[in-house]
Each structure stands twice: as structure tokens, then as C-alpha cells.
């Protein structure tokens, strides 16, 4: 059940030896491919331990591990494009909470998943660690209720 060339059209970054790293926020770099199992509900999880953004006030770097979990529908995010997209935040000035919500919204726009959650585990600055959590469940489905439930239980992980 290998993927054929036609199914891989639109994937341009994976395997490209001349990778160009974006110098600014670049949601357009995200690429998607078809989910071969849209009738199965399953989680895909990414752990991204090298996320960096800038404080919008001081310009100082902020570091985080970003956790992305989603239940795909028709489309899935290609991992190298996700890596480059997350790298594009390196020179982007935004608060931790904004970064997590932007990542979630960009991935929703790309994939239209059944469910998605993004959790940012930012390293402490000034003695305070900020851990924003954002999620979404497709309206009118069981995943809308899942999102509500997970929102209030996410700290129990």
C-alpha cells in the first residue's frame, strides 16, 4: 500500500537537499498530503523540543517544547514542512499564548482536522514558566465535545 507519485504531488520539501530556512513567520511553507485512513480515528503526535520565538517587548529569545496532537480527517501535515514552519517563529515576536494559538489555527487552515491540540511548554523567564494549551474539535461532531472535555482536563496529563 505504498504511495504513488500522484499522491505525493505538492510535497516539495521532503527529500530536498537545498532546504531554505525561512527568516520570518511563514505559514505558507506548510504542506499537506492525503490521509489514506480517513475512516479511522487515530492520533498523530509531534513533539518539537527546539521551538524558539522572540518576546515582542524585549526581543529576547523564548524556548519551548511544542506538543501537537491531532486526529486527521482528509489531510495530514508533512513533517519537514512543519519543522520549517516552526523554525519560522525564530525571529517572530509574539507572546507564548499567541504562538500556540497561531500554530493551531494555521494547522486547522491547512488540514481541517477532526480534532487538534497544541501545548507549549515554555522554559521559565523571570522565574515563571508559561504553558499555554489550545484545542479545537470540528463543530457538530463528537470531537467538539472532546475539545471541551480536553480543555478542562489537559493539566491531568
UniProtKB/Swiss-Prot annotation:
Localization per record: Cytoplasm
E.C. number: 1.7.1.13
Entry GO CC: cytoplasm
Binding-site residues, substrate: 77-79, 96-97
Source organism, top-level taxon: Bacteria
SUPFAM superfamilies linked to this entry: Tetrahydrobiopterin biosynthesis enzymes-like
Active-site annotation: 55 (thioimide intermediate), 62 (proton donor)
Biological process according to GO: queuosine biosynthetic process; tRNA modification
HAMAP family in the record: QueF_type1
Protein name from the UniProt record: NADPH-dependent 7-cyano-7-deazaguanine reductase
Species annotation: Neisseria meningitidis serogroup A / serotype 4A (strain DSM 15465 / Z2491)
Protein's gene: queF
